[in-house]
C-alpha cells in the first residue's frame, strides 16, 4: 500500500522505485519511505522514542534524518532496539524500529505478536513538507495480522 501524505490518499504507482507520487509504503511490518534506496524522493524520517503526540507540533531543531538503505529500512531500523533477543523466547523477540515482536514469548498479547512501540516519527515528505506520524496497530478489529494502521498530521 502506497500513501500520498499530502492528499491523504492511497496511490498505486506503476513503478514505485522511480515515481514521486507516494511518501510511505506499507507491506506487513515493512514500511518504506520515498527516499534513499526505496524511491527517488527526498523523504526522510526522524524518530522520537517516547515522544508525546500532542506536544509534537514542529520539527525538532536537533532532528537526525534517516532514509532507507540497502539492508535497513528507516522505519524498521529507527529508533534502535532497546529490547533484544531473549534466549527464553527463542532469541527472536525484540524491538524492530516501529514495532516490538514477542517471538516465542507471551508478553501479554500472545506469542508471535507485533505491537507498535511508543514512537513519534517526524516525516519529511517527497515535497519537503513535514508530518508527525505514529503507528497505532498491526491487526485489524477482527485480529487479522498485516493490517497496519497509523495516524499522521502536518507540522508547522
Predicted feature residues:
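Surface-exposed, beta-sheet-biased, low-hydrophobicity segments with strongly acidic/polar composition
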Residues: 1-156
Amino acid at each position: 500500500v502506497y500513501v500520498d501524505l499530502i492528499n491523504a490518499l492511497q496511490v498505486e504507482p506503476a513503478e514505485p522505485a522511480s515515481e514521486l507520487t507516494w511518501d510511505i509504503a506499507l507491506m506487513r511490518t515493512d514500511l518504506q519511505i520515498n527516499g534513499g534506496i526505496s524511491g527517488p524522493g527526498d523523504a526522510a524520517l526522524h524518530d522520537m522514542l517516547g515522544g508525546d503526540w500532542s506536544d509534537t507540533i514542529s520539527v525538532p531543531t536537533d532532528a537526525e534524518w534517516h532514509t532507507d538503505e540497502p539492508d535497513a529500512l528507516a522505519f524498521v531500523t529507527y529508533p534502535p532496539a532497546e529490547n533484544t533477543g531473549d534466549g527464553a523466547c527463542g532469541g527472536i523477540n525484540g524491538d524492530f524500529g516501529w514495532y516490538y515482536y514477542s517471538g516465542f514469548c507471551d508478553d501479554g498479547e500472545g506469542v508471535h505478536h507485533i505491537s507498535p512501540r511508543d514512537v513519534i516519527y517526524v516525516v519529511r515528505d517527497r515535497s519537503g513538507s513535514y508530518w508527525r506520524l505514529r503507528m497505532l496497530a498491526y491487526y485489524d478489529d477482527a485480529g487479522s495480522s498485516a493490517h497496519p494502521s497509523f495516524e499522521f498530521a502536518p507540522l508547522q
